[in-house]
Swiss-Prot record:
Main location group: membrane
Any GO molecular function: C-C chemokine receptor activity
Subcellular compartments: Cell membrane
Regions of this protein lying in the Cytoplasmic compartment: 55-69, 142-149, 214-239, 305-359
Pfam families: 7tm_1
Domain of life: Eukaryota
Membrane topology classification: Multi-pass membrane protein
GO BP annotations listed: angiogenesis; calcium-mediated signaling; cell chemotaxis; G protein-coupled receptor signaling pathway; immune response; positive regulation of cytosolic calcium ion concentration
Name of the protein in its database record: G-protein coupled receptor 15
Record text on subunit structure and interactions: Interacts with adapter YWHAE; this interaction promotes ER-to-Golgi transport of GPR15.
Positions of transmembrane segments: 34-54, 70-90, 121-141, 150-170, 193-213, 240-260, 284-304
Positions of modified residues (Phosphoserine): 358
Length: 359
């Protein structure tokens, strides 16, 4: 097969396709053959353990389950499925891009990465919408924020993500270049580039805009609530801090690589091309950040969500009485939702009184 019939920029696993136009440098080889295998091994070990503990803690915890926990469990499951394929990519990077595990795993692992990417973005979007409904529209959200609705939404996300991953499954193949096996993508046609551009916009940038918008509205509502109630010191700072960290982690993990991917697709559709070396370097540097997102989520939840922290400690050390759940399963979210509901009812009551007086 002609090396020029491979593409380097249509996947979320940046360097899975060889690019014969870019020569290896002395600094590039240690990065791909030494740093990346070590980095991916660390991501694999911490991510598998962290997501297993997170799923077990939330699934087997005593008491009722929060609605947000359903999305978190599915997100952890998606990350875990992806992380299982990481040893294949460790071997690939250690062997300087050679794929030594056969065609089935070439297609299957690439498909799992695509499904994980879509599933993660959609679940994070649903979690932001859930927080938005719970905090900004607590009264109206009671009709939609139900357990059965959450399960239906998660099942739909998995189904849609599996469908969106099919183009990757069909386009990946094990090809020989200079008698060496590579897990590569077939040549990108103009139609495929257009599809990739549309898919990237609607499966990443639109959800990203949704997430940022939801959390901005949440922050605005929290500021208004705490200023009105007179409690705007520690609680306000903590709530805003968690929101900013969640948004920042998402942006740092996904935005750099998808930006380079967007530039690469646009470059392929236009006569003027961006320097291929620049795009390759950008994807090689930003790609591991997207991979690492699958292992950092459990740590973010453990550090910043006291409810999940108690669940994990209770799961690992049931004998610790200080972390017992007790009879109450309410969290800061539920307390805040109740407070905002009361606040909204009070606003409505005041508004109606003013209207009746004016009449």
């Amino acid at each position: 097969m002609d090396p020029e019939e491979t593409s380097v920029y249509l996947d979320y696993y940046y360097a899975t396709s060889p690019n014969p136009d870019i020569r290896e440098t002395h600094s590039h080889v240690p990065y791909t053959s030494v740093f990346l295998p070590v980095f991916y091994t660390a991501v694999f070990l911490t991510g598998v353990l962290g997501n297993l503990v997170l799923m077990g803690a939330l699934h087997f915890k005593p008491g009722s389950r929060r609605l947000i926990d359903i999305f978190i469990i599915n997100l952890a499951a998606s990350d875990f499925i992806f992380l299982v394929t990481l040893p294949l990519w460790v071997d690939k990077e250690a062997s300087l891009g050679l794929w030594r595990t056969g065609s089935f795993l070439c297609k299957g692992s690439s498909y799992m990465i695509s499904v994980n990417m879509h599933c993660s973005v959609f679940l994070l979007t649903c979690m932001s919408v859930d927080r938005y409904l719970a905090i900004v529209c607590p009264v109206v959200s009671r009709k939609f924020r139900r357990t059965d609705c959450a399960y239906v939404v998660c099942a739909s996300i998995w189904f849609i993500s599996c469908l969106l991953g099919l183009p990757t499954l069909l386009s990946r193949e094990l090809t020989l270049i200079d008698d060496k096996p590579y897990c590569a993508e077939k040549k990108a046609t103009p139609l495929k580039l257009i599809w990739s551009l549309v898919a990237l916009i609607f499966t990443f940038f639109v959800p990203l805009l949704n997430i940022v918008t939801c959390y901005c509205c949440i922050a605005r509502k929290l500021c208004a609530h705490y200023q009105q109630s007179g409690r705007h010191n520690k609680k306000l700072k903590k709530s805003i801090k968690i929101i900013l960290i969640v948004v920042a982690a998402f942006l740092v993990s996904w935005l750099p690589f998808n930006t380079f991917k967007l530039l690469a697709i646009v470059s392929g559709l236009q006569e003027r091309y961006f320097p291929s070396a620049m795009l390759q370097l950008g994807m090689e540097v930003s790609g591991p950040l997207a991979f690492a997102n699958s292992c950092v989520n459990p740590f973010i939840y453990y550090i910043f969500d006291s409810y999940i922290r108690r669940a994990i400690v209770h799961c690992l050390c049931p004998c610790l009485k200080n972390y017992d759940f007790g009879s109450s399963t309410e969290t800061s979210d539920s307390h805040l939702t109740k407070a905002l509901s009361t606040f909204i009812h009070a606003e409505d009551f005041t508004r109606r009184r003013k209207r009746s007086v004016s009449l």
